[in-house]
Amino acid sequence: MAKQKQQYVTIKGTKDGLTLYLDDRCSYDDLMKEIEERLVKRSSVAANSPLVSVHLKVGNRYLTPAQEEELRALIRRSKNLVVDSIESNVISKAEAIEWVQKTEIVTVSRIVRSGQVLHVEGDLLLLGDVNPGGTVIAGGNIFILGALRGIAHAGYAGNKEAIIAASVMKPMQLRIGDVMNRAPDYKTDERNEMECAYINEHNQIVVDRLQLLMHLRPNLTRLERRM
């Protein structure tokens, strides 16, 4: 009895089209060969048939941009199939570095003086002051163990869940995501208590005691535990 050939492609129909589960242990060439055999050569669909979306799940296989394009082109040859998404469990080195930069906590010990700009991709922990005219910008949260008397912009890429915290909160301007507070409408005093700025349910920046943060942002725990 002839041994049954192992299949590297599993096809499942969904309400959104077709999902192809591609084996991540076989060679790339064997994978392409089976896709061509099952989807292209056996295709008998009329040229005017409606397009069907195809979602590829490639598991732990990394595909280069050129290989992704080759896959899309091969499947498109079956007349009515078009690749809508390619999902992989792995990322490239460049993507990994970018992810780390955006999620890491960057600790800086310095004074940001007038005219200076300190910019980080992830969360910022500043051990020092931000003087009037100085600016700190972060892709994530900003924590200042010192006085904030200049400009602070957290979540600059649009993250409205970001917060700004400082030992002394007397900023010239606060920005979180695309929300800006030019003239803070809150009063500060000389209490030795950290304060934090966040966006409330009315899409406005408000400042309150840092202790309230555990209720406002329960998932924000990485830096608070260190301060």
Curated annotation (Swiss-Prot):
GO terms for biological process: cell morphogenesis; division septum assembly; regulation of cell septum assembly. SUPFAM superfamilies: Cell-division inhibitor MinC, C-terminal domain. Keywords: Cell cycle, Cell division, Septation. The keyword Acyltransferase does not apply. It holds the Pfam family MinC_C. NCBIfam families: minC. Interacts with MinD and FtsZ. Cell division inhibitor that blocks the formation of polar Z ring septums. Rapidly oscillates between the poles of the cell to destabilize FtsZ filaments that have formed before they mature into polar Z rings. Prevents FtsZ polymerization. Belongs to the MinC family. This is Probable septum site-determining protein MinC. The lineage of its organism: Bacteria, Bacillati, Bacillota, Bacilli, Bacillales.
